[in-house]
Amino acid sequence: METIGFHYVVEAAGCDPEILGNADKIRQIFLEAAKVGKMEVKASYFFKFSPTGVSGVVIVAESHISIHTWPEKGYAALDVYTCGTTADPEKAVDYILDKIKAQYAHVSEIKRGIEEDDETFTHMILTWEEKLERKNGDEKS
């Protein structure tokens, strides 16, 4: 059984609130994450809420990367979905988590569009949690 795509659903906590509240910084991180994950960027849009929070999406040839942030809680909800075999969505997820300085991540990997013999599509979910070895004050490159 082959899969059509990989969808990473990520809960990130203990993130740097200053980064989560900065739409330009989040855009920069996401565009670089697309490169790191070997994705071809087609478009992007990021919106800064008042008084706080950012929502944004990068459309890539392989699908999309999106985020919704709650800086006051140090929390971000991420989606990274790719189709095909050239992209590396896990590298993009790791890059984003590092740059937003997440202390904790709960990641679900969903294999989307697994074709069964009777031409129905199912998906498989793999979930893991990580306590990340970084502190908000630490600068990692």
From Swiss-Prot:
It catalyses: S-adenosyl-L-methionine + H(+) = S-adenosyl 3-(methylsulfanyl)propylamine + CO2. Keywords: Autocatalytic cleavage, Decarboxylase, Lyase, Polyamine biosynthesis, Pyruvate, S-adenosyl-L-methionine, Schiff base, Spermidine biosynthesis, Zymogen. Belongs to the prokaryotic AdoMetDC family. Type 1 subfamily. GO terms for molecular function: adenosylmethionine decarboxylase activity. Binds 1 pyruvoyl group covalently per subunit. Transmembrane segments: none annotated. Catalyzes the decarboxylation of S-adenosylmethionine to S-adenosylmethioninamine (dcAdoMet), the propylamine donor required for the synthesis of the polyamines spermine and spermidine from the diamine putrescine. Pfam families: AdoMet_dc (PF02675). GO terms for biological process: spermidine biosynthetic process. Is synthesized initially as an inactive proenzyme. Formation of the active enzyme involves a self-maturation process in which the active site pyruvoyl group is generated from an internal serine residue via an autocatalytic post-translational modification. Two non-identical subunits are generated from the proenzyme in this reaction, and the pyruvate is formed at the N-terminus of the alpha chain, which is derived from the carboxyl end of the proenzyme. Heterotetramer of two alpha and two beta chains arranged as a dimer of alpha/beta heterodimers. This is S-adenosylmethionine decarboxylase proenzyme. The active site is at residues 63, 68, 83. GO terms for cellular component: cytosol. It comes from the Archaea.
